[in-house]
Amino acid sequence: MGGGVSVELPKRDPPPGVPTDEMLLNVDKMHDVIAPAKLLEYVHIGPLAKDKEDKVKKRYPEFRLVNTGPGGLSALLRQSYNGTAPNCCRTFNRTHYWKKDGKISDKYEEGAVLESCWPDVHDTGKCDVDLFDWCQGDTFDRNICHQWIGSAFNRSNRTVEGQQSLINLYNKMQTLCSKDASVPICESFLHHLRAHNTEDSKEMIDYILRQQSADFKQKYMRCSYPTRDKLEESLKYAEPRECWDPECSNANVNFLLTRNYNNLGLCNIVRCNTSVNNLQMDKTSSLRLSCGLSNSDKFSTVPVNRAKVVQHNIKHSFDLKLHLISLLSLLVIWILIVAI
């Protein structure tokens, strides 16, 4: 029997390990990646040394640090949103901010702590209490308040909490604005009630405006509360008073009762110029200018389109027959020669 043959293979060191994408992550360069994470979402942050764990936890208190693999591989799991109402509600563009020494910034700086705003924070009603107070103060942004009031009429949040917040807001706005509708937040509320255009919103508008003081009505609502003389004068005209009364055409439409607002919308206001050289009138005289619009066949309220007018005239003019004109010209010349 022959003996076996053994072959000794050369020895080689194993190839160096190739790091995975997760192993190449650096938590110190991921501020803008971690901040937008949604609730219960994991964000992998790569290997994390033990001595850096406390620093990361302090920087991201809304997250829980989770071990995901060997070599210190870790991830952050979002558990909460710690942003405050004054910092999140008084703008529509902020999703998070960094806080350091009592000051906030949209950009990270060393030593800052992340505070995030609830997604769709305005839509959920979480801003109603803060903005209701802020929009009555001295430092409010009128555009922000106007946008917030408008968004309240179009909220998609249908939870019990969200609906109750909306009801509370409407009740507080009605109470506040019934006392003085000239407050900017109240004028915005009336504007959006009008745009909402439901029977309930119209009733609320009229209720609020009828509660105003006599001084308010005299200053802002003279169209809705005309004088006796103005009412007697209105009996002379067929069209609604809102169409010719300057107190209506020049009024702030937010302070018109629904009846007056609707009548004003039916008016066809035409401006015309009148020149009078000499006019003598007594108590029995009357004067009324209609701008010639009573005869619809002769006058039109539609703006004149010059191009269309020219095209219309060409279309309805007689056709020019050049050869006939030439013959007539020769005939006239021949008659003149014979006559001479």
Swiss-Prot record:
Keyword annotations: Fusion of virus membrane with host cell membrane, Fusion of virus membrane with host membrane, Late protein, Lipoprotein, Membrane, Myristate, Signal-anchor, Transmembrane, Transmembrane helix, Viral envelope protein, Viral penetration into host cytoplasm, Virion, Virus entry into host cell
Transmembrane domains' residue ranges: 320-340
Induction of synthesis: Expressed in the late phase of the viral replicative cycle.
Location of the protein in the cell: Virion membrane
GO terms of biological process kind: fusion of virus membrane with host plasma membrane; symbiont entry into host cell
Recorded topology in the membrane: Single-pass type II membrane protein
GO cellular component: membrane; viral envelope; virion membrane
Main location: virion
Lipidation (N-myristoyl glycine): 2
Residue ranges of the region described as Disordered: 1-20
Protein's UniProt keywords contain tRNA processing: no
Virion surface side: 2-319
Domain of life: Viruses
PTM annotation, UniProt: Unglycosylated because produced in viral factories instead of the classic ER -Golgi route.
Function, in words: Component of the entry fusion complex (EFC), which consists of 11 proteins. During cell infection, this complex mediates entry of the virion core into the host cytoplasm by a two-step mechanism consisting of lipid mixing of the viral and cellular membranes and subsequent pore formation.
Subunit structure: Interacts with OPG143. Component of the entry fusion complex (EFC) composed of OPG053, OPG076, OPG086, OPG094, OPG095, OPG099, OPG107, OPG143, OPG104, OPG147 and OPG155. Except for OPG095 and OPG053, each of the EFC proteins is required for assembly or stability of the complex.
Homology family: Belongs to the orthopoxvirus OPG086 family.
The protein's name in its UniProt record: Entry-fusion complex protein OPG094
Provenance organism: Vaccinia virus (strain Tian Tan) (VACV)
Lineage, broadest ranks: Viruses, Varidnaviria, Bamfordvirae, Nucleocytoviricota, Pokkesviricetes
